[in-house]
Amino acid sequence: MTQSVVQALSAFSQRFLQHCAQQTGQLPENDELLGLASPCVVEELTDVVRWRPVNREVWADFSNVERAIELTLHEDIKAFYASQFSADMPAQWRGRELTLLQVWSEDDFTRLQENILGHLVMQRRLKQKPTVFIATTEDEMAVVSVCNLSGNVILEKLGTAQREVLTADLETFLEQLEPKVN
C-alpha cells in the first residue's frame, strides 16, 4: 500500500498544480511561507512565495516518534509525510473543504513530529485509538486523520471519541480529493 499512497499523493499534487495553472495562470502562491527556506520554493516575490511539490531523495524517518511513543506508525502515514516536500494544499472531499497538511522543509518535519507525538500522547491519556492527522477542516476542532490500527481515513473531533470513517484507506481518499485554489 505504501507505494500506492505515494503515487496517489503525487497524482493529487499534480492535479493541484494543474488546477492552480488553470485558475491563476501560475504556480501556487503562499504568503505565510515567505522567507522560510524549502526545496519547494520556485520564486520569492515581495509578498508571496511561488512553489511546487518536490519529491524527497531520501524519505523522512519517523523512528524517533515511534520510539518515544512506543508505537509503530501505519506505513501509509509514514509514506504520506515522508515522500515529498510541499506547502499545505486546499482541497475538497465530497463537498467538504479541507487543507491537506504537508511538510515544507526539514525544520517543518521536526515540528510535525512534535505535533504528532503530542497528538498521540493526548489520545493515549484519553484512552482513544491512535490516529495521525493529515488534514484540517473549517471546524478547528475537527481533523481528517488516518487510524493507526486500521488505515481508515476518518473525520475526528479532537478530544472526543467522535469519529466518522470517510474511506477505507489513504490511497482512496487521495484519489477522491479535488484540488481547490483559495
Curated annotation (Swiss-Prot):
It comes from the Bacteria. One of its GO terms (cellular component) is cytoplasmic side of plasma membrane. Transmembrane segments: none annotated. Gene3D superfamilies: Syd protein (3.40.1580.20). It comes from Vibrio cholerae serotype O1 (strain ATCC 39315 / El Tor Inaba N16961). It is found in: Cell inner membrane. Keywords: Cell inner membrane, Cell membrane, Membrane. Belongs to the Syd family. Interacts with the SecY protein in vivo. May bind preferentially to an uncomplexed state of SecY, thus functioning either as a chelating agent for excess SecY in the cell or as a regulatory factor that negatively controls the translocase function. This is Protein Syd. The keyword Membrane applies. NCBIfam families: PRK04968.1. It is a peripheral membrane protein. The gene is syd.
